[in-house]
Design a protein with these regions (language model features):
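Hydrophobic transmembrane alpha-helices and their immediate junctions
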Residues: 32-75
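Short, structured secondary-structure boundary patches
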Residues: 17-20, 42-43, 58-62, 100-104
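Transmembrane alpha-helices of multi-pass inner-membrane enzymes
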Residues: 67-112
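Generic hydrophobic alpha-helical membrane-span motif
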Residues: 7-9, 39-42, 90
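Long extracytoplasmic/lumenal interhelical loops at the membrane interface
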Residues: 1-32
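N-terminal low-complexity, intrinsically disordered patches enriched in charged
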Residues: 10-12, 42-45, 111
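Generic recognition of well-ordered alpha-helical segments
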Residues: 24, 28-34, 47, 74-78, ...
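Extended hydrophobic-aromatic, low-complexity segments
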Residues: 1, 37-39, 112
Length: 112
């Protein structure tokens, strides 16, 4: 990995050693620079828009369900990253949008 979290994983401090701002975008900016933040936000935006386009285009209930859950949960995670440390503490929550997005893409591929 990169940045302060990876450094923390290799340190000997067991509790209370991780001090990061409660904003994942600030942390990503420090770890990956502005290019990393812009690329991440671009990927988030593309997933949200594509999910809602798929929701409008397809009639299959499973595809629509995966699309709306992927798009809305991605938007929720992106907003939560502004006020909390989603990347550091909630990796399970961070993976839900990508899981539903992958299921949506698989269902679309299976329909063709």
């Amino acid at each position: 990995g990169i940045g302060s979290v990876q450094n923390y994983m290799y340190s000997n401090v067991v509790f209370g050693g991780l001090k990061v701002p409660h904003n994942d975008y600030v942390q990503m900016s420090c770890d990956s620079g502005i290019i990393g933040v812009v690329l991440y936000l671009l990927a988030v935006f593309v997933i949200i828009v594509h999910s809602f386009v798929v929701y409008q285009k397809y009639t299959d209930v499973s595809i629509k369900m995966c699309a709306i859950v992927a798009g809305s949960s991605m938007a929720g995670v992106a907003l939560t990253m502004y006020t909390d440390n989603v990347v550091n503490y909630s990796m399970a929550t961070l993976s839900y949008p990508f899981g539903f997005y992958g299921m949506m893409l698989g269902l679309i591929k299976g329909e063709k």
